[in-house]
Amino acid sequence: MNKEEYSDISDSESEEVHETNNHNEHEHEEEDDTPEIVVPERKFLKEDEDYSVPFPVMRECLVLLLQSRRILRDMMYYRFKMDRFLSGNLSVFEIQNLLHSQREDKESDWIAEIQELKRNLVSEVRRNHTLERDLNRLDKRIALLIKNRGNIQDVLADKAGLKAPKHKGDQKKPELINDPKKLEAYQNLFYLLQTEPKYLAGLVYLIQPEQMESFLGTVILTLFGDAFTPREEFLLLSLYRLSIQKEMANIATVGDFLKADTVVPKMIITYNKRKQGTDYLKAVIGPILSNVIKQELNLELKPNLVYAAIISEQEIRTGEKSTLDRNVSHEKALEVPEVTKTIKARVDQLISICEQFLDGIISSLNRLPYGIRWICKQIYQIAEKNFTKSTQDEILKVIGYFIYYRFIQVAMVSPEEYDLVGREIHPTARKNLINVSKVLQALFNFAQFGSSEKHFIPLNGWITSHMGDIKNYLQEIIEVGEPEDYLQVDKYMELTQKTKPVIIISLPEICNTHQLISKNLDSLVAKGEKDDPMRIIMKELDEFGPPPDIAADDDREVQLTLSNKFQKTIEEELSPGESLLSQTKEMVISLLRALPTLPEQKDQSDEPPNLVDVLNKARQADPSLEPEIKKILDNLKKLEEYNLTTSADNYSSFLKAVALEVVNRAEIREQQKKEKQRLTTSLNNLRKHQKYLNEQIAQYNQYLQDCRLKHYQNKSKKKKKGDGAKVGPFKFSFSELHKKGVIVDSEVPQITRKKIKFVISSDTVGVFDVSAKMAGIDVQTMRLELDDLLELNSIGTTTLELDQITLDVNMTIHLLNKLFLY
């Protein structure tokens, strides 16, 4: 209704609303104080009934009331029915009806393909694990061979008197990680911290406030990297989601989230300091800042300070000392026309600059780092769920706090910290930026200036006019997809990495993290959970004693190649129970769709037939269904073994899962489509990784062969042929090898030992044939490989048991080196 319609009604209050041609002329002649009953158009009155008679009007109202009650009852029934549908609490009859109402579209169902992809994925994962083990073994053998070669060179240098003396400044491997097993334990520890957010999300609440900044630096900048990689970003965002959930579960109002002693805001501030955040500030805020600074403006708005500045300018211009009082009140200064004129001009300039920043911020929404936007989305969604009494504006204020006050404003008032301007900022320019930031802060806080900052009140109009823009901007910030889609990573991500993740971490960071976890282990992990991965790793580290105290200024860094000690848990995610559940649900859905419609229950007091009853009746009615139904019932029993359902409630939990799948069929199929795409991508990546591993193994084998050849080059030069030249043979008596410490034990009888000669030769690099001869006849032949001996040495094995004799590993290596390498 427009303005004219409102005025027509108010000018003639006695006019009747319903239009009738017979009474129009009489309605303006006189006013009657008797209240009239206004009735809507006639629907239920008879033609000969008069509106002035009360009973027909009452009957009309009763009919409308009854009609309203029926509509309300239908709405309540529909709401109840929808709640049941969405929760999956449907009977078999209702599920079947719903299936019959849906269009069967087999082409868009990818259950079978997804399960096949998962089976292939597990197969490829296992194959890749085998290849990775082979590759690691080759890598270790190469390292041991090189180390052995180095030891030989040291011996030769000692003999020739050429070995250089050690200098005081020579770097040694840090004692903290000088043991390979200890190093591996730390690599397992930091991998677990990186991939299981529950541990770090718990730790941040257990550290002392004075340790918070350094700990967050370790967590965010060291453990997850400063530069953007999808894997680290995905893991870090998982940590933030869990931390926000924990934080908001322990506060009373959404406003408490912004208090100084809460943890998550500090985490978010640290997150914003990463490369993505600083790159955004340099690209968006930096140019505007430079433009404002170079203008050499003065945006002081306090009237008394403006008044004092005008007096100073007059003194400089005239060269005469002013007799005016500089210390005047706010109100007194505003009585001076030049002050009000100056302030008005500065307000206009301030608004213009605020417009520049606001336009830059809003227009660069798509350049805002994804992680910051997604964290804001989590804050909004979790706050909306936890604090149902909070208004949308109250939640948006929290988003504005993190986006502006803790991110953009920090860079505006201290641009040199982010290297946004290439010059020193004059105090006046910095004060200008502070004034601009205050105005924008009020805008992002949906607030206006009051009596405490009266000089900013002229900006209130501009703030009010742009509040809608800011609300829209903050709402658009949280319109982002999930990390799985944006970053193209998922739970199969770890299976497709060509190289293990690596972090560069300082020794104090390793020690501090170790000490922090040791101190708070019982708070992080329940005492009864002895098989918890964190407890297992910490138990291994405890075997090496407590971490040493390392000075905070010790800047030595080490590279940790992170590894998963619990690799089997990844394959367990692709459990047969999950596959069987999906398969059985699909079988039940297909069967219910094919069966004739079940009769509807007439007596609502009776219990609806359960799934087992329906299946048994179906196979009695149609014996051809016996194999399929038997398979379903067998699967249900297996699912019960996996604790995925139970016969105690007649498999109602399974039926609920079937109902939810049918109700949400379209959404589930879309999820299946995405899952299929992800699995296909993961499988392709695994196969690419497999090709890469095979290539690496081939290169490592060649390199290992080259290393072996270098070991033999001195000896082989004495032969006419190089690679295939046979070196040796070398002959030793039993007593000689025993005296050298090579043979440490033997089951050979004493009387026979004197007659035995050992002949050692090599026609393949790194492989040694040892023949035991008696009276010139071979009694026994053994084959030793230097790689195997070096590996035994590396794991601390001191002896090697062969048939009837036991060799000392170290002395055997020494002998072979001396014979074939020196």
Swiss-Prot record:
Asked if the keyword Transmembrane helix belongs to this entry, the reply reads no
Query: What would you give as a GO molecular function for this chain, any one?
Result: protein kinase regulator activity
What else does UniProt say about it? rgaA lacks rasGAP activity in vitro. rgaA expression is inversely correlated with the speed of cell motility.
Q: What is the lineage of its organism?
A: Eukaryota, Amoebozoa, Evosea, Eumycetozoa, Dictyostelia
SUPFAM superfamilies attached to this UniProt entry: GTPase activation domain, GAP, RGC domain-like
Its main subcellular localisation, reduced to a broad class, is cytoplasm
Output the superkingdom of the source species: Eukaryota
Q: Where are the stretches annotated Required for interaction to rac1A? A: 161-822
All copies of the Ras-GAP domain together span 234-477
Q: Where is this region: Disordered?
A: 1-36
Q: Where is the composition biased (Basic and acidic residues)?
A: 15-27
Question: In the UniProt record, which is one GO cellular component term?
Answer: cell trailing edge
Q: Self-association or partners: how does it assemble?
A: Heterotetramer. Quaternary complex with activated rac1A, ctxA and ctxB. Interacts directly with rac1A and ctxA. Preferentially interacts with activated forms of rac1A, rac1B and rac1C. Interacts with racE.
What's the protein called, per UniProt? Ras GTPase-activating-like protein rgaA
Which SMART domains does the annotation name?
RasGAP
Could you tell me which Pfam families the record lists for this protein? RasGAP (PF00616), RasGAP_C (PF03836)
List the gene name: rgaA
Q: Which UniProt keywords apply?
A: Coiled coil, Cytoplasm
Which species is listed as the source? Dictyostelium discoideum
Compartments in which it is found: Cytoplasm, Cell cortex; Cleavage furrow
